[in-house]
Amino acid sequence: MQVLVRDNNVDQALRALKKKMQREGIFREMKMRGYYEKPSEKRAREKAEAIRRTRKLARKRAQREGLMSNGRISALR
C-alpha cells in the first residue's frame, strides 16, 4: 500500500494510510489473524455475520418502505 507525502506532512500521510487500510479491511484481518481460529469457530462466526447482514438489510428495506420509524415497527391501523 502506498501513500504520497506532500510538503513533508507526515501526519496527513498517516491519516490517509490509516483510512486506506480501514477501507481495505486490513485492521480487521490483523485482528482475526492475531490468534488461531478453529474451523468450527470460523463457520459459526461467518454464519452469525451473514445473519446480522441479512437482518440489517431487512431493517433498511422496511424503513425505506415506511414500515418502520426510528428502528421500531409502527402499528398498522
Curated annotation (Swiss-Prot):
Keyword Transmembrane: no
Keywords per UniProt: Ribonucleoprotein, Ribosomal protein
Pfam families xrefs: Ribosomal_S21
One record GO biological process: translation
Family matches, as HAMAP family: Ribosomal_bS21
Domain of life from the UniProt record: Bacteria
Organism: Bartonella quintana (strain Toulouse)
Coiled coil: none
Disulfide cross-links: none
PANTHER family for this protein: MITOCHONDRIAL 28S RIBOSOMAL PROTEIN S21, SMALL RIBOSOMAL SUBUNIT PROTEIN BS21M
GO molecular function: structural constituent of ribosome
Name used for this protein in its record: Small ribosomal subunit protein bS21
Taxonomic lineage of the native organism: Bacteria, Pseudomonadati, Pseudomonadota, Alphaproteobacteria, Hyphomicrobiales
GO cellular component, one term: ribonucleoprotein complex
Annotated spans, Disordered: 55-77
Statement: the UniProt record of this protein carries the keyword Ribonucleoprotein: yes
Family recorded in the similarity comment: Belongs to the bacterial ribosomal protein bS21 family.
InterPro entries: Ribosomal_bS21, Ribosomal_bS21_CS, Ribosomal_bS21_sf
